[in-house]
From Swiss-Prot:
The gene is trxA. The record marks 32-33 as: Contributes to redox potential value. Pfam families: Thioredoxin. This is Thioredoxin. Disulfide bonds join 31-34.
């Protein structure tokens, strides 16, 4: 399963109403650390494809959702389960950090 892009308009359908846990990568094209973490997010999407959904949302193009969730710095990675935000990881973190955070929410 590849990483899909979501927008302010599709966020509820793709993230909130999803049966699987969802990892949301809040990013922007000009953000260097976002580009550093992008391959990690892509690898997570491949390795966990049967357990989670992974999406990215460009905060420049979709400011409503970014503001709603209080995004102050990017990259910010949020985990949603059953429509609720359950965890947040801020910054370009190692894959192991992201995996250990995700594993808490995968049954």
């Amino acid at each position: 399963m590849s990483v899909s892009q979501v927008t302010d308009a599709s966020f509820k359908q793709e993230v909130i109403n999803n049966d699987l846990p969802v990892l949301v990568d809040f990013w922007a094209p000009w953000c260097g650390p976002c580009r550093m973490v992008s391959p990690v997010v892509d690898a997570i999407a491949e390795e966990y494809e049967s357990s989670i959904k992974v999406v990215k949302i460009n905060t420049d193009d979709n400011p409503t959702i970014a503001a709603e969730y209080g995004i102050r710095s990017i990259p910010t990675l949020m985990i949603f389960k059953s429509g609720e935000r359950v965890d947040t990881v801020i910054g370009a973190v190692p894959k192991s950090t992201l995996e250990s955070t995700l594993n808490k929410y995968i049954s």
